[in-house]
Structure formats: structure tokens, C-alpha cells
Amino acid sequence: MRFIPYGNRRVTRWSDDAHSEVVMDRYEGKRINRPNDVVCKSDGSIWFTDPGLRVPLADKDLPHSGVYSVKPDGTSRLVAEFEYPNGLAFSPDERTLYVANTRHAQYIHAIELDTTGNMVRRRIFADMSSEETDGVPDGMKVDVEGRVYCTGPGGTWVFAPDGAKIGVIRTPEVPANLAFGGPDLKTMFFTARTSVYTLRSKVPGQPHPWYRVRAK
């Protein structure tokens, strides 16, 4: 399955045989603004950010930006409102959802969830404010040991599970997004303005719920 969350004010699911299905395009009867990033949970639910990027104010049906979830039965809910939510990723145990806020207060928020997916607590996980002007908190991934990787000012920032900053991965261009790939999920891919860069990691990325890592 492929999820296309950007550009047409809806989240669309595409299967390998080119069949498409609209996952969500409205909340409480109003058109969502412009979804940005999407992740899936092992229970089959789909979670995405909607910062309303480049939607004229007059065209916005919903006054807020936020994080939404959609259950397999199609039931949707607003998980939390944000100023400008962008990348998001689950912790390995799926008890915490990390969300990057791109503008002004450049924080990664940690949303702690109960077993039903409701927010029980929200806190600041990491501060990505920087004097570097190239790059903002954007794409995000987590590895199997719980480290959080987020593209941002100057490169890809790496945080320990407790929020402590480990360092910054520098690439020739500042990337906007990243992914773990390859048969063992130890190849990191960084997408930037003109190129895609790769780096081998000692630790595999957290697999998607439907992905099985091939052991070596």
C-alpha cells in the first residue's frame, strides 16, 4: 500500500494493482486542509499531520492544524491541535507518537497514548531551535532501539529515547525527509533538493507494521 497525503486535500491509499481509495478528506463534515505526513499503527489505524500548507485562508474549512487518526472502520478523530505539525513517527512500542512542529516553536512533541489511541499526555520531547538557517523540523523516523531521527536545521538530528541530543548527521544538502530501507533496514535514505543520499547504519530502523526485516 502507498499513501498519498499531499496536494489534493485528502489522504488516498493506493494498492500495488493501482486501485485507489480515499482514506479521509473531511472531518466533522468539513474538508481537511492539506495533509503532509502519514504513519500507520499495527492495529491498522492511519495517522497523519495536517498543517494546512499553502491553503489560502479563505479556502480553509477547518480553522485549526493538527494530527488526525483514522481507524480501519473509517472512524476519524482529531488527536491534537498544533501550530504547524509536520513529520511524525511512533516509538517502537507505539505508546508514544512523536510530532515535529515546523514553524516558530521548533519542537518535537511527544504524545503519550492509551491502549485505545487517545492522548493521555503531551510534552516537549526535544528543542530543535538553531542559529542555522537552512532546514526546519520536518521528516522523522525511529530506529528499533527508540532513537528519534528528524531532519532539521543543518542536517538530520538524532535523539536518544529520553530526548537527549546525540548529534547531527551532515549530508551535502540539508534533507527534508529520511527513511530506513534495504533488506535489513540499515540503509538510511535522505531526500534533499537535488539528490538522494544514503548512509549505512549499525541499527535498523523501526519496521512498518506490515514489513518483515530479512535477517542476515
Describe each model-derived feature in a short phrase:
Residues 8, 62-65, 105-107, 119:
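A detector of repeated loop/turn-to-beta-strand junctions in beta-rich toroidal repeat architectures
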Residues 110-118, 200-208:
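Short loop/turn segments immediately following beta-strands, especially the blade-tip
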Residues 1, 11, 67, 97, ...:
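Hydrophobic beta-strand positions in blades of beta-propellers and related beta-sheet-rich domains
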Residues 6, 51-53, 102-103, 113, ...:
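Short loop/turn segments immediately following the C-termini of beta-strands
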Residues 1-5, 28-46, 61-66, 78-99, ...:
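Beta-rich, blade/repeat-based domains predominating
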